[in-house]
Amino acid sequence: MPEAVDPRSWSKRAGRHTPMSIAGVGAVTGYGWGAKHVWDGFMLGESAVQLHTGLDGYVDGGQAYVATISGDGARPGGPSRFMRALRFAAREAIADATERGWQPGPVVGVIHSMVLGDVEMWRDYYRSETGTVGGRQWVQMMPGTVISMMMKENDFHGPAMSVTAMCASGNAGMITAKSWLDTGVATDVILLATDLSGIPENLRRFQDIGVAVLDMPPFEGCRPFQEGSRGFVGGEAAVALVLSNQNVGTYADVLGGAMTMDAWSAVSIAPDMVQMNRCFNEALAVSGVDAGEVAYINAHGPGTAQCDAAEARILDELFPEAHGIFSVKPLIGHCQGAASAVEMLATIYAFQTGYIPAPPRVAPGHPRLITGRTPRRRGMMVKSSIGLGGYNSAVVVAEPTV
């Protein structure tokens, strides 16, 4: 059990805006259970998206391309895919960080980036004849239960909360975690981002509003920043990142980030882009970075006309010196509430291997669109994420200093 520590002995760090290190990584994705499968998928340039059949009555043609997480019910962690994937990712990230020299500080907090929670358990609950389940199962459905189980397993007792900002939830969690470290709320943070909502009911709704493409392979239908793109392909992910100010071997340093809200439309980007521009500029300002120091934009890039046009405009106007822009959604799918967290792994991969894991270009597109696995030039990256409803977010990430 960790020794009790007087908060005054570590709160002297409060207010010191030092880089926040990503010290450990865990992931469950359409590639498989474990971050290694993500690295392998990025290296090979292969998509995790597969064709799923038997969806008659939900999607046109009864089949859809989506990067779902396998059930793998033999793994420990709980009765649902959601719970098992979250706890697996957390275990992997903590073990990874420990191997790299990280040790839990006196106050380890947990932030869970999520949107819909355990959709399969809630779906079964509402579809039951009586609308009731046993008390134990009902408690397991609560979003705080799996966090409590994860923290109990690791003897963590710091602050814990869930954050939601639609598709920008992962970035929202990252920015919140940095504020905790900067102000002394926690000494370390486990950031979790979980979204296993790739069920037929949700896929159909995204198709209905014209943003998802279900009937074409990923590289054909989802073409971020290219002509002929029809939208995004669905995806699922559970990601865990160990975040700390400790001087240990790290994957990347998060310098800062910002968020704004358009407050204009539930489904569209404000055409004047005032708030989106402010978001990127504030992210640079709080990070102490000039736009000219940014080499790449790891974009939200869902392949929808509005989002791609907006981020391309940001690239052209705010980052004219950047080497390029890319989006890994054709590779890993749009993982909704976990999107920006799982896409942060692409930045980590680039820093660790020296290659940008961009999908191949299949049509004419933006002149600075990175195509295929490409050698990386030195410089910082901005991870942007846009959430349905008007959420804008940007996080500035630098190569690790340790």
Indicate where each model-derived feature is located:
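Short, well-ordered amphipathic alpha-helical segments that serve as non-catalytic structural scaffolds
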Residues: 85-98, 144-146, 272-288, 314, ...
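Flexible, low-complexity linker/loop segments at domain and module junctions
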Residues: 1-22, 104-105, 291-293, 369-402
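Acyl-CoA/ACP chain-elongation machinery
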Residues: 185-209, 216-222, 229, 257-271, ...
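Glycine-/small-residue-rich "gating" segment that lines the acyl/pantetheine channel
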Residues: 131-133, 175, 179, 197-249, ...
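Condensing-enzyme catalytic core mediating Claisen C-C bond formation in acyl metabolism
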Residues: 18-28, 35-63, 217-287, 293-296, ...
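Conserved small-residue
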Residues: 22-24, 42, 90, 110, ...
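Phosphate/pyrophosphate-binding loops at sites that engage ATP/ADP/AMP, CoA/4′-phosphopantetheine
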Residues: 91-108, 154, 247-251, 279-296, ...
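Conserved catalytic cysteine-centered active-site region
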Residues: 8-17, 49-87, 117-176, 185, ...
